[in-house]
Amino acid sequence: MSDQTPAATNGRPPIHVVTRDEFEAVADVIMPVVYPVTIAMALCVALVNILHTPGVESAGTGGMTTAVYAEKASDSASVKLEGAMANAAVFIAFITAATFALFLLFKYRLAKVIWAYMGFSGLLIFGLLGGNILLQVLDKLEIAVDMISVYLFLWNFSVGGALMTFFWPGPLVVKQGYLIFISTIVSYYFTQIPEWTTWTLLVAMALYDLYAVLTPNGPLKMIVELAQERDEDIPALVYESRGPPDAGLRRRRTSARETAESRTSEATSEMSPLIQDRSPASDDGDSRFHLPDSIKLGLGDFIFYSVLVGRAAMYSPITCLCCFTSVLFGLVITLLGLGLYGKALPALPVSIALGTLSFFGARFYLEPFVVDLYAHGIFII
């Protein structure tokens, strides 16, 4: 690929040709985000395949997601839609109130309360929810393990996970692993929500993400701006995608062939979450992509990505694969948008939109087409 950009013609701006070095540099930043999302979704799909009984639809797990309406198979489509929208509205209202409460606690410097709450929640997720899943898996796979060993494992896993995730310093890879486990555990329980409520909730969360991140009065935007003003870390469940220490060095060495002088000023890498503006220090000379060496992604994004793919896995491998690739493609588009525009971007809308369209397209069009081809002995290679 040429390093020359064609001159502007007919009043049009010159076309930027992405070089191989630029492509490799962008891939080095994006892949550390794609890998953990892939692992989280794959684990959720594995749990669904192991524990879900085909043909048996859960009537709901209770709680906030079914506070208004409990879906029944005998209900009409209009009743299911109205009930699902009511459930989604209640859930979004709860999330909005909780986020504003988080903002007020952070504003008045009560971060210790936030950390204490998250630590307690993490302990419950690892110990109770995770323990319940573990017992179900052992029972389903008919694996005999004595209860003392199970309790000792759960004690170490839950207490160690809560401390390493929220309080103790430790290896980044360990914290990343525990965060992936949190997203897997929570997302599996969300897959037990009734179907209509699930899809309505996913769409509602994508719309809420747009409001919370992009609007001036959005709660997430207000929290990020306050954190930037104080130069403090946000007390939240955030996955940091910083890769191995040599990744940034390898990327700089590769790109140094083209922009050695401009790279000199980038010795210090910047961390830029999807809900936070890009630092100007991460610019890469003439490159159109300005992704930093490290990106932070909210754990809620992991959870709802996994819920979508887990729900798709309940129907067929075709729908699951289509949704899986669509969600990852949407995430890559969002990350490229972050690099191109350097603005705060919500991570849910693009992936949820593509994943939802892929699910219904595969379920109602692609899968019947493939089954019909198979029934007639036609194979496309």
Spans of model-derived segments:
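Multi-pass alpha-helical transmembrane bundle typical of ion/small-solute transporters
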Residues: 1-381
